[in-house]
Amino acid sequence: MKTVIYPGTFDPITNGHLDIIERTAVLFPQVIVAVAASPTKKPLFDLQDRVQLAEESVAHLPNVRVIGFSGLLADAVKEHDITAIIRGMRTTMDFEYELQLAHLNRVLSQGVESLFLPSTEQWSYVSSTIVREIYLHNGNVDQFVPPPVLNALNRRRKADA
């Protein structure tokens, strides 16, 4: 069975990510959402929380599962017998970076290809970074994130108050 992987930090997972996951789940029989530890990015949510939020956000998709990983994506690709790496692209600004990653991952994973899926217009401007910025400045992010993330952000805001 063909299994693809959609990696990211997902800090937090957004409706843009969810759109890519839902569209990928229609195209492939098995999708793994791989949440990267990314300790150098100083995430808002720890890895365990990001995995849980991703799981809750994709619970309606029976052919999607979520894993957390640290280290190289190529190692997760080998471990899970991945057919292709899915990458979402919002704008041409993403292209150069994603192309470099695709070449690097092809070398490190012995030939596994990266497939680029363009964002829909509705979500082309949404990123986790923008969501965090809006949240940290007490803005409203409910139109940009799935309900589990919104609930977690609201709980976090109340705890910080």
Swiss-Prot record:
Q: Where is this site: Transition state stabilizer?
A: 17
Which compartments is it annotated to reside in? Cytoplasm
One BP annotation, GO: coenzyme A biosynthetic process
Catalytic activity annotation = (R)-4'-phosphopantetheine + ATP + H(+) = 3'-dephospho-CoA + diphosphate
Q: What class of enzyme is it?
A: transferase
**Is Cytoplasm a UniProt keyword of this protein?**
yes
The biological pathway it contributes to is: Cofactor biosynthesis; coenzyme A biosynthesis; CoA from (R)-pantothenate: step 4/5
Name of this chain's protein: Phosphopantetheine adenylyltransferase
The scientific name of the source species is Actinobacillus succinogenes (strain ATCC 55618 / DSM 22257 / CCUG 43843 / 130Z)
Q: Which gene encodes it?
A: coaD
